[in-house]
């Protein structure tokens, strides 16, 4: 199935989804190591079998990752390599998603009920807005199809809604600073204790200075994952979730809490 799709001159959104599932064997949401090498091998074989030249994007991709064991790509990168239908590809090219800070602001806008999730209707509005910003419109049937596919692509725990970390896979890997925090998330009890410790004036939210102190301590304790030289960037991205400079417990929990007690 994946081979025949890779031979196509134009890949539909549904075919793209099938290709991704085929190669993301461990369901991590990223292609790395053997998964990435399998994709490259099958892509080369499929194009040769179909008598098709590699596109410039494919050639650049093969040159960049073909000889590397440490390569890692997400859905965004693959969407730029394969000849995907235009409107679906636009969802991965939006200016709003070029930086983590803009992504956080977009999240805040569409998580309208502040639940910490974007649910189906919110996701549909999000995608519709992205397409409109690119001066593209799709009918309701196509929009529903894209929404369904996005859920299938990004909803790693299959709960029918997207968490911040799931939605962040719309960002290119190098822009996704949330990946840095995946390995240092705290259980619910630890997170609440930390929040109360750094909310020094006890007003129920953390301001920029209090967040700065928290991040410095996290960097000191987790030097492998976090770089203290990037604190300004971390802070700017996280504060984009705040409400007028006030970072409430539920907002910070999206970044630092694993949710368990």
From Swiss-Prot:
Modified residues (N-acetylalanine): 2
InterPro entries: Calbindin_Ca-bind, EF-hand-dom_pair, EF_Hand_1_Ca_BS, EF_hand_dom
Pfam families, A to Z: EF-hand_1, EF-hand_7
Entry comment, domain topic: This protein has four functional calcium-binding sites; potential sites II and VI have lost affinity for calcium.
Residues involved in Ca(2+) 1 binding: 24, 26, 28, 30, 35
Gene Ontology terms for molecular function: calcium ion binding involved in regulation of postsynaptic cytosolic calcium ion concentration; calcium ion binding involved in regulation of presynaptic cytosolic calcium ion concentration; vitamin D binding; zinc ion binding
Residue ranges annotated for the EF-hand domain, each copy included: 11-46, 53-88, 98-133, 142-177, 186-221
Binding-site list for Ca(2+) 4: 199, 201, 203, 205, 210
Function as written in the Swiss-Prot or TrEMBL entry: Buffers cytosolic calcium. May stimulate a membrane Ca(2+)-ATPase and a 3',5'-cyclic nucleotide phosphodiesterase.
Gene field: Calb1
Tissue specificity as recorded in UniProt: Expressed in the modiolar nerve root and in bushy neurons in the ventral cochlear nucleus (at protein level).
Taxonomy of the source species: Eukaryota, Metazoa, Chordata, Craniata, Vertebrata
Region listing for Interaction with RANBP9, in residue ranges: 2-7
Family: Belongs to the calbindin family.
Residues annotated as transmembrane: none
Keywords: Acetylation, Calcium, Metal-binding, Repeat, Vitamin D
Name of the protein in its database record: Calbindin
Quaternary assembly: Interacts with RANBP9.
Source taxon at top rank: Eukaryota
Binding site for Ca(2+) 3: 155, 157, 159, 161, 166
Binding positions (Ca(2+) 2): 111, 113, 115, 122
One of the GO biological process terms: response to auditory stimulus
